[in-house]
Amino acid sequence: MLKIGINGFGRIGRLVARIAMANPQVTLVGINDLVPASNLAYLFKYDSTHGSYGGTVVAKEEGIVIDDQFIPCFSQRNPAQLPWGDLGADYVVESTGLFTTYATAENHLKAGAKRVIISAPSKDPEKIPTFVVGVNHLNYNADTDKIVSNASCTTNCLAPIAKILDDNFGIVEGLMTTVHAMTATQPTVDGPSKKDFRGGRGAAQNIIPSSTGAAKAAALVLPQLKGKLTGMAFRVPTPNVSVVDLTFKTEKATSYEEICAAMKTAAEGELKGILGYTADDVVSMDFRTDPRSSIFDAGAGIGLNSNFFKVVSWYDNEWGYSCRVIDLMLTMASKDGLV
């Protein structure tokens, strides 16, 4: 049995908790968030995007009870002061978005956790290894990897298709665009935004060009693609589900039909459950609460010639990503002898 704690009970933290509650190999032993337990229980039970939780949720003064299991809640600003050791937490999911360097994430280890999984790109990629399930997760080293990053939701969508493309046809270079659902960092109406003026515009009113490191980060899990991919984002007024558009040149002359065939083979074989394949006339909300990292849309891509193509792949940027957090932890726990 893998015992986990969650630091930061926002969109990802709550969905990781839902998925953990449904997995008999995982038990949730503690939550840390500055929000009171009564509000955390409410937000866990009712979800505007993924629907209400199917079990029972009751708020207590010092925690929440989910399906008759009491889970203590804490409100510590400094992770080093959390009682992870006393709770027996094997792993901690760091999902505040704040502690993404080695020095800050290490505080969970000082508090007694054995491993830390950051649910975001790391700001110390040279110290903290990045893993994408289905691509390089088996490279986890139980002796050295105490803090790891699960990359971003977009990298989790991009990396599997980039791997299949590079393995089969070779990628010379490529440009990625993610059309990304709005997130909690965006304001509902126009307001100030210190680093990114456009990012301060109303999320529900605008298509907003933005930066993303997701394409470059793919090289952290596929080193052979270093310097070959970059990308940008459009934030759009939808609540959930995003889509990657990858335009690329191939080393090997091929056809769009051959690319689709390679994706279908991978989706039904080595990447089953991670990569999906569809030829249906689908739209974004058809993928709400889809547990896969990336769903290749055969009908949406195009080819210009035998070496220049565009492929399209969908992802539930909340649920699919949260599923991979659990999957990565279970892979690590297997190597650590915990499950």
Curated annotation (Swiss-Prot):
<feature type="binding site">
    <location>
        <position position="119"/>
    </location>
    <ligand>
        <name>NAD(+)</name>
    </ligand>
</feature>
<dbReference type="InterPro" id="IPR020830">
    <property type="entry name" value="GlycerAld_3-P_DH_AS"/>
</dbReference>
<feature type="binding site">
    <location>
        <position position="317"/>
    </location>
    <ligand>
        <name>NAD(+)</name>
    </ligand>
</feature>
<keyword id="KW-0560">Oxidoreductase</keyword>
<protein>
    <recommendedName>
        <fullName>Glyceraldehyde-3-phosphate dehydrogenase 1</fullName>
        <ecNumber>1.2.1.12</ecNumber>
    </recommendedName>
</protein>
<dbReference type="InterPro" id="IPR020829">
    <property type="entry name" value="GlycerAld_3-P_DH_cat"/>
</dbReference>
<feature type="binding site">
    <location>
        <position position="235"/>
    </location>
    <ligand>
        <name>D-glyceraldehyde 3-phosphate</name>
    </ligand>
</feature>
<dbReference type="InterPro" id="IPR036291">
    <property type="entry name" value="NAD(P)-bd_dom_sf"/>
</dbReference>
<feature type="binding site">
    <location>
        <begin position="152"/>
        <end position="154"/>
    </location>
    <ligand>
        <name>D-glyceraldehyde 3-phosphate</name>
    </ligand>
</feature>
<keyword id="KW-0324">Glycolysis</keyword>
<dbReference type="InterPro" id="IPR006424">
    <property type="entry name" value="Glyceraldehyde-3-P_DH_1"/>
</dbReference>
<dbReference type="InterPro" id="IPR020828">
    <property type="entry name" value="GlycerAld_3-P_DH_NAD(P)-bd"/>
</dbReference>
<dbReference type="InterPro" id="IPR020831">
    <property type="entry name" value="GlycerAld/Erythrose_P_DH"/>
</dbReference>
<dbReference type="GO" id="GO:0006006">
    <property type="term" value="P:glucose metabolic process"/>
</dbReference>
<dbReference type="GO" id="GO:0004365">
    <property type="term" value="F:glyceraldehyde-3-phosphate dehydrogenase (NAD+) (phosphorylating) activity"/>
</dbReference>
<feature type="binding site">
    <location>
        <position position="77"/>
    </location>
    <ligand>
        <name>NAD(+)</name>
    </ligand>
</feature>
<dbReference type="GO" id="GO:0005737">
    <property type="term" value="C:cytoplasm"/>
</dbReference>
<feature type="binding site">
    <location>
        <position position="183"/>
    </location>
    <ligand>
        <name>D-glyceraldehyde 3-phosphate</name>
    </ligand>
</feature>
<dbReference type="GO" id="GO:0050661">
    <property type="term" value="F:NADP binding"/>
</dbReference>
<feature type="binding site">
    <location>
        <position position="33"/>
    </location>
    <ligand>
        <name>NAD(+)</name>
    </ligand>
</feature>
<dbReference type="Pfam" id="PF00044">
    <property type="entry name" value="Gp_dh_N"/>
</dbReference>
<keyword id="KW-0963">Cytoplasm</keyword>
<feature type="active site" description="Nucleophile">
    <location>
        <position position="153"/>
    </location>
</feature>
<keyword id="KW-0520">NAD</keyword>
<feature type="binding site">
    <location>
        <begin position="11"/>
        <end position="12"/>
    </location>
    <ligand>
        <name>NAD(+)</name>
    </ligand>
</feature>
<feature type="binding site">
    <location>
        <begin position="212"/>
        <end position="213"/>
    </location>
    <ligand>
        <name>D-glyceraldehyde 3-phosphate</name>
    </ligand>
</feature>
<dbReference type="Pfam" id="PF02800">
    <property type="entry name" value="Gp_dh_C"/>
</dbReference>
<comment type="pathway">
    <text>Carbohydrate degradation; glycolysis; pyruvate from D-glyceraldehyde 3-phosphate: step 1/5.</text>
</comment>
<comment type="subunit">
    <text>Homotetramer.</text>
</comment>
<feature type="site" description="Activates thiol group during catalysis">
    <location>
        <position position="180"/>
    </location>
</feature>
<dbReference type="GO" id="GO:0051287">
    <property type="term" value="F:NAD binding"/>
</dbReference>
<dbReference type="GO" id="GO:0006096">
    <property type="term" value="P:glycolytic process"/>
</dbReference>
<comment type="similarity">
    <text>Belongs to the glyceraldehyde-3-phosphate dehydrogenase family.</text>
</comment>
<keyword id="KW-0547">Nucleotide-binding</keyword>
<comment type="function">
    <text>Catalyzes the oxidative phosphorylation of glyceraldehyde 3-phosphate (G3P) to 1,3-bisphosphoglycerate (BPG) using the cofactor NAD. The first reaction step involves the formation of a hemiacetal intermediate between G3P and a cysteine residue, and this hemiacetal intermediate is then oxidized to a thioester, with concomitant reduction of NAD to NADH. The reduced NADH is then exchanged with the second NAD, and the thioester is attacked by a nucleophilic inorganic phosphate to produce BPG.</text>
</comment>
